[in-house]
C-alpha cells in the first residue's frame, strides 16, 4: 500500500522526528514517488544521484541551489565544501552541485583537518546539525557561506555557523532564522 490514495493530495513533505510507530524504511515504501517532494523514496533518491531531473530533489538541497542561482553564483569549477552527509541534505546537495560542474567535497565528523577543507572552499554549505560549529577559522574572505542548520541553544534558534563571528569575514552568508534551512 501507499499513501495518499486521494487525488486531492498533491505532494507529501515529511517532518521529523517521526512518531515511534513509523520507521523511515516503512515511510520510504509508503510514499509514492510522484508525491514525494523531499526525495525520500528510493526512486526519487536514485534519480537525484543519477542526475535525472524528472523526480524531486530534497526540498532543502533544492533551496540551496535556488538561492545560489538567484544570486547568479556560477558553480562551474568552484570548490564547494558541504559539511554534513545526510541523505536529506548533504549527499543529494553534492549531486546537485556536481550537476552544475562544481568540484565537491563532503566533510563530516570524522574528516581530518576539517577547518582547512572548509577554508579552501569558494562556497561552504553547513548542514551538519551542530550548533555554531563553523567558526571564523573555517572560512576565508570572499567565501559564500550557506547555513542550512536549524538548532536551538538556550531557547534561541541558531545555525551550524557562528554567524556573528563568520559574517565579519565572508563575502556572503545566509542567516538563521531567515535562511534556507
Where in the sequence are the language-model features?
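Glycine-rich phosphate/diphosphate-binding loop of Rossmann-like nucleotide-binding domains
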Residues: 46, 54-144, 153-167
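Anion-binding alpha/beta catalytic cores of soluble intermediary-metabolism enzymes, centered on
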Residues: 13-75, 79
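Redox-cofactor binding/interface segments in oxidoreductases and associated redox assembly factors
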Residues: 10-14, 126, 146-147
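Short, small-residue-biased leader/transition segments that mark boundaries at the very start
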Residues: 1-8
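Rossmann-fold NAD(P)-binding glycine/threonine-rich loop
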Residues: 23-46, 146-180
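Conserved residues at the C-terminal ends of beta-strands
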Residues: 15, 83, 176
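Short glycine-rich anion-binding loops that position phosphate/pyrophosphate groups of nucleotides
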Residues: 15-21, 129-132, 150-152, 179
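Acidic active-site catalytic centers that drive phospho-/nucleotidyl reactions
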Residues: 6, 122, 147
